Each structure stands twice: as C-alpha cells, then as structure tokens.
C-alpha cells in the first residue's frame, strides 16, 4: 500500500499576513486571493493562480469552484489551500480521469444528456488507453497538452456549467473539489514525486478555464 505523505494543514482562517479568500484573480495579495493564489503563497512561490505544484486540470477546476461558490463555502475551502502544493500527478491518464469524474458528477443532474454521455465515453476511452503508459517523452506530453487545451477543457467547462446551475451547487462543487484534491495527492504520492519537485518540461502555466 502506498504511503501517503503527511498533509500540510491549513488553518481554518488565513493566518495574519495572508490575504482573505476572494473571487477571481488578483494583481496583488493586498486585494485578496483566490484558492490557487493562496496555495501558491503557502507553498512559498510567486503570487499566481497556476502554482507549479498543482496539476493544470485540477487548478482549472479549483478556479471555477472558487469563483462560483458563495463566501461561506469559499472560506470553508481555505484549509485545502496547502494541499495543492503536492497535487500534480505525472501519470498521463490523470487529466482524462479528472475531467471524466466531473462529467460523471454532472450526469447525476442530467442523466439523459447525450452530450455529457459522449464526453464521459471519450474520457473513459482516453483513460483506458493511457493507463500504465509511461509519462516520459516529448510527443506524449505534447499530445496530452493538446487534448487538455482542446476537448478536455471543453468537457470540463460544460460539466461545470451544469453543476453550477444546480440548486445545491455550493455543496456539490465543494465535495467534488475535496475529492479531486485527495485523489491528486494520492496519485502524486504514488508517483514518488518529491514534495515541491520540478515541473516536467512543457507543463508550465496553463490558460484559465473560466477567465
């Protein structure tokens, strides 16, 4: 059984000197910080909403959740901020697995949606194809990046629009993000990646999902 790395605990409220949780991106910590910007500060990095230790697809999910939920839920999610520093799995199937889990959550609300069903099948096919595929190699990384910036992101955005329209959207989105972070950290630990390790080439800052 894979040993899980010790979790860095965030306080329930931001410590003195750290910005209060807020929606959207910020130019300066004095104006507040979204969940990803808080994660970057806690990791000791630059003030950015795309911290190096967080997988781009997970960061995109976190930005949408942060910007879509109410203030109370956003503050309740603050303890997750430190977890994002070690949430960048290297296995190539991870992106499609994450997007597929969001699509599945949306299908609970719209089980008859042919579009969501098609997106879910596409994610499953890609995940099955890439499971146990080595992470190395520029061609593979380029193909993964193209999928994420193309259909992967479109599938994620559509599923999140469905979830955001639910009457209990805050609860659904918060639960989804908590599970996604836990899964990403578990997979990162399984990769044997050193905490705060180097970001693989070609996987730098991603475009934003919702901005």
Description of each model-found segment:
Residues 2-78:
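N-terminal, leucine/charged-rich tether regions that mediate assembly and partner docking
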Residues 47-204, 208-211:
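Structured binding/interaction patches within domain cores
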């Amino acid at each position: 059984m894979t040993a899980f790395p010790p979790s860095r605990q965030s306080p329930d409220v931001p410590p003195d000197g750290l910005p209060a949780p807020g929606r959207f991106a910020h130019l300066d910590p004095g104006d507040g910080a979204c969940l990803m910007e808080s994660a970057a500060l806690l990791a000791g990095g630059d003030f950015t909403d795309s911290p190096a230790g967080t997988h781009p697809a997970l960061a995109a999910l976190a930005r949408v959740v942060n910007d879509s939920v109410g203030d109370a839920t956003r503050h309740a999610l603050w303890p997750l901020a430190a977890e994002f520093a070690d949430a960048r799995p290297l296995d190539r199937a991870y992106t499609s697995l994450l997007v597929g889990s969001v699509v599945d959550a949306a299908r609970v609300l719209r089980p008859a949606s042919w579009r969501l069903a098609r997106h879910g099948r596409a994610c499953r096919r890609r995940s099955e194809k890439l499971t146990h595929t080595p992470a190395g190699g520029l061609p593979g990384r380029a193909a993964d990046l193209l999928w994420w910036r193309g259909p992967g992101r479109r599938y994620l955005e559509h599923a999140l629009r469905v979830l955001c329209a639910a009457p209990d959207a805050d609860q659904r989105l918060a639960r989804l993000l908590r599970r996604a972070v836990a899964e990403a950290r578990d997979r990162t630990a399984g990769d044997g990646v050193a905490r705060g390790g180097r970001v693989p080439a070609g996987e730098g800052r991603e475009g934003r999902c919702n901005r």
